[in-house]
Design a protein with these regions (language model features):
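Glycine-rich, small/polar surface segments that engage phosphate groups of diverse ligands
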Residues: 53-83
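Short linear loop/turn motifs
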Residues: 32, 85-87
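Glycine/proline-rich loop-helix segments at beta-alpha junctions forming the active-site rim
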Residues: 76, 80-81, 88-260
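A conditional alpha-helix N-cap/helix-loop micro-motif detector
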Residues: 26, 66, 104-108
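Active-site and ligand/interface coordination hotspots across diverse enzymes
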Residues: 1-64, 203, 208-260
């Protein structure tokens, strides 16, 4: 899918979100907030739901939590324009309460379709309700800063999910803010791990001799629309959050990537 095709598909979904009446939240919203960002990105950030400022402007993460997210991205040399940002629910829950299970379920098809279009390498969850969509049963106090393969049923067919605290929690608790900077510093390395994992999956046997193409050959194949994400060149050091991800071309078993 080309960049233009992705953008067009995302705009169709956004139009459906703005007209949505699938749950009670449409009765109290000012604007629905479909999400925004680079349609060719490799990294998608998924928050919990819009707040007051987002409801007013129709854009995700534009309040104080959004300002912190921009600073977190800047700490690794990224801009919010480099990624795609959305939420598990697209309308503001009244009084900024937690989204209810049926509200999350009502929005699930929109998020799944967005991820199918974007086909990200990494999904970064922000907060426990977002994390619960991709890491059922995990506790954010244990899971933040770690990753695991995404269930293809979520729409991200071949991605890794990386858990973080919500920026709003970081604003309330200095210790969580410090941990959030530590966590986001690992996201570029998670991106490399996902790229290597995808390259290994894409190797195909040659019919004549049964030879399998190496990762290097896959990695250097022309990309009609390179995605502008920066990631460290070096392989992860021993002891890092993804120390079980080897630098070799072999496919990493998914159980080795489940780190908690």
């Amino acid at each position: 899918m080309t960049r233009a095709e992705r953008q067009a598909a995302l705009e169709v979904i956004a139009g459906e979100v703005r007209a949505c009446t699938r749950c009670r939240l449409h009765t109290t919203r000012t604007q629905a907030v479909p999400g925004e960002g680079d349609p060719s990105t490799e990294v998608v950030f998924v928050g919990e739901g819009p707040g007051m400022n987002e409801d007013r402007l129709g854009r995700p993460f534009v309040g104080r939590a959004g300002d912190l997210l921009v600073r977190l991205l800047g700490s690794i040399g990224w801009r919010r324009e480099d990624v795609f940002i959305t939420n598990v629910v697209k309308c503001r829950p009244p009084d900024n309460r937690d989204p209810e299970a049926d509200e999350i379920a009502a929005c699930e098809p929109y998020l799944r379709r967005q991820l199918e279009v974007l086909d990200p390498a990494v999904v970064v969850t922000l907060g426990r309700h977002s994390m619960g969509r991709f890491m059922p049963g995990a506790r954010i106090s244990h899971a933040h800063g770690t990753m695991r393969p995404v269930d293809p049923a979520t729409g991200a067919a071949d991605a890794l999910v990386f858990a973080m605290y919500h920026p709003a929690a970081a604003l309330r608790t200095p210790a969580i803010e410090r941990e959030s900077y530590d966590d986001i510093a690992r996201v570029p390395t998670a991106l490399i791990a996902s790229r290597e994992r995808r390259a290994a999956r894409e190797r195909t046997p040659v019919a004549a001799g049964g030879v399998t193409a190496g990762t290097a050959a896959v990695a250097t194949a022309p990309d009609p629309e390179p995605k502008p994400m920066r990631a460290p060149e070096a392989s992860p050091e021993p002891g890092s959050v993804i120390e079980s991800q080897p630098a070799s071309a072999d496919l990493v078993p998914t159980d080795q990537l489940t780190l908690f």
